[in-house]
Amino acid sequence: MSQSVSLTFPDGSVRSFPAGATGRDVAESISKSLAKSAVAIAIDGGVRDLSDAVTDGKIEIITRKDPRALELIRHDAAHVMAEAVQELWPGTQVTIGPVIENGFYYDFAKNEPFTPDDLPKIEKKMKEIIARNAPFTKQIWSREKAKEVFAAKGEQYKVELVDAIPEGQDLKIYHQGEWFDLCRGPHMASTGQVGTAFKLMKVAGAYWRGDSNNAMLSRIYGTAWADQADLDNYLHMLAEAEKRDHRKLGREMDLFHFQEEGPGVVFWHGKGWRIFQTLVAYMRRRLAIDYEEVNAPQVLDTSLWETSGHWGWYQENMFGVKSAHAMTHPDDKEADNRVFALKPMNCPGHVQIFKHGLKSYRELPIRLAEFGLVHRYEPSGALHGLMRVRGFTQDDAHIFCTDEQMAAECLKINDLILSVYEDFGFKEIVVKLSTRPEKRVGSDALWDRAEAVMTDVLKTIEAQSEGRIKTGILPGEGAFYGPKFEYTLKDAIGREWQCGTTQVDFNLPERFGAFYIDSNSEKTQPVMIHRAICGSMERFLGILIENFAGHMPLWVSPLQVVVATITSEADAYGLEVAEALREAGLNVETDFRNEKINYKIREHSVTKVPVIIVCGRKEAEDRTVNIRRLGSQDQVSMGLDTAVESLALEATPPDVRRKADAKKAKAA
């Protein structure tokens, strides 16, 4: 057995340490201050306890400033919260408490569920525990000891968790003072390193193991950050997000609603449907030159989904349907008992369209697009306005091309996606390549080729953007049928939304026997590229509403102008103004009610009308208009013709304006 361990440091230097040396020993060998600020170590990228013995490899000392420390802070905060709860309410059982995005939660078995009023008490107790600065220490227990100890404490859920751990796997028990828990780790050095930049956010109910047949537990959500400034920024972002909640704004703007009879499907009101159709019309114009729009059936026999693999891989997310008569008359032997499925994706239908008729290599690439309504089952608790629904429209396209055309097609798709996002005002975009997962179809040679091409494409995207577009790699995150690009955009308050995707597919063309005739008159399987820009049109609309806080750009707004009169003497002129704006292509309503003008302005501001034109006796005499913008107290007076021309230009979609500008430039 080696008497020393060889460690490579970030600066490239290599040092030897005696076998059994811990991460803390290594940190202390560098400096006392580093040892004091260290919270963990990483060996070859794997995060470990500071008290763990080091092994040969590349070592990093992790401090609170390291992004990786955030998960440790949140993990430890969850343990501190669990201890606080059991100190305050003895007899409460702890179950599981993972780190989640922006925070953590812990589920408890308690006779009476927690209320929001309990949270300040728990926070106070947590601060006491943190102030004790008890060290986290790890022990390895036998399965028998763990079950015996937890059973004696009345922790039946922990006994069940112990039983679920595979035989031969270590059972780690972490102590913080007298309190302990079953946990895989790692943890920081002590409770004091959690700090005080945390907040408990809300309480909720949750079924044990997410199964509605099991007991209902009481869940507490919390958030924790490296410092108070980060916590304050996060809480400010949440407050902003609450103001911008598309569900609230959707009601105020009269765009859509949901109801019990149709969980997860949208009831579009007139104004909401107008925005939806504006988005679809915009996307149709962007696709008109390069894509052929098609429409595949929504209901198809399960045999097709068995061939595609969805019935095996994706069945739990699908809706199965059959004749209502067959369902209500199971004993009727004459009933049609075929089982169909509502399509969860458009791709199998597009393969059928590609296969219909012989295709030559000269015809490739063939680009098929569809605004396809798809249905996917989501648990009722996961549904969230337009962001998480059961029925939605995908701006889907599938490109069938040769292997040699793959790179050019991916770049062409990238240019389109970035251009669309820019038209909606999104400037900060991240493009990441997701590579092969462990479970996948296709040979390694196919994956090697596809990943090599897409890696080169990613480099080209980064180079062409001159630093504007950030790129990255997501190892093992690809789909089972091929690598993919994921496009993430950042909104006005800093939240990130993954929207667009470009996915190479080795699976469906092979499963369905799709082919084209190549230059040697041989049958050849095409490369299939899945492409979505918005992803879900409903979700993208929800993102737009929240990004703009309901203050939609004029070209997107369902109602662009309200003409409001101060006095009935100006009504005739108000009608003339409204008609002139309509003739210029704007969506206009009039408000000639016998109400004070400030009341009218407030009312239309609540519904987020972007432009209110005020007309009184003076404006009628001078043939002018008084323009008031949403969110501004300023008023601008201008001549009617000038106002119509200016607003018509502003209401012109950006792609239409570019085309007109290019035409003018060419004519000049």
Curated annotation (Swiss-Prot):
GO CC annotation, single: cytosol
Annotated positions binding Zn(2+): 347, 398, 530
PROSITE patterns: AA_TRNA_LIGASE_II, TGS
InterPro entries in the record: aa-tRNA-synt_IIb (IPR002314), aa-tRNA-synth_II (IPR006195), aa-tRNA-synth_II/BPL/LPL (IPR045864), Anticodon-bd (IPR004154), Anticodon-bd_dom_sf (IPR036621), Beta-grasp_dom_sf (IPR012675), TGS (IPR004095), TGS-like (IPR012676)
Pfam families reported in the protein's UniProt record: HGTP_anticodon, TGS, tRNA-synt_2b, tRNA_SAD
Region: Catalytic, residue numbers: 245-553
Cofactor notes: Binds 1 zinc ion per subunit.
Domain annotation TGS: ranges: 1-64
Subcellular compartments: Cytoplasm
Catalytic activity: tRNA(Thr) + L-threonine + ATP = L-threonyl-tRNA(Thr) + AMP + diphosphate + H(+)
Major location (coarse): cytoplasm
GO terms under biological process: threonyl-tRNA aminoacylation
Gene Ontology MF terms: ATP binding; metal ion binding; threonine-tRNA ligase activity; tRNA binding
UniProt keyword terms in alphabetical order: Aminoacyl-tRNA synthetase, ATP-binding, Cytoplasm, Ligase, Metal-binding, Nucleotide-binding, Protein biosynthesis, RNA-binding, tRNA-binding, Zinc
Required co-factors: Zn(2+)
The protein's Enzyme Commission number: 6.1.1.3
Keyword Nucleotide-binding in record: yes
Source organism, top-level taxon: Bacteria
Xref: CDD domains: TGS_ThrRS, ThrRS_anticodon, ThrRS_core
Family: Belongs to the class-II aminoacyl-tRNA synthetase family.
NCBIfam families named among the record's database cross-references: thrS (TIGR00418)
Record-linked PANTHER family: THREONINE--TRNA LIGASE, CHLOROPLASTIC_MITOCHONDRIAL 2, THREONINE-TRNA LIGASE
Subunit: Homodimer.
Function text: Catalyzes the attachment of threonine to tRNA(Thr) in a two-step reaction: L-threonine is first activated by ATP to form Thr-AMP and then transferred to the acceptor end of tRNA(Thr). Also edits incorrectly charged L-seryl-tRNA(Thr).
Identification of the protein by name: Threonine--tRNA ligase
Organism listed in the record: Rhizobium etli (strain ATCC 51251 / DSM 11541 / JCM 21823 / NBRC 15573 / CFN 42)
Organism placement in taxonomy: Bacteria, Pseudomonadati, Pseudomonadota, Alphaproteobacteria, Hyphomicrobiales
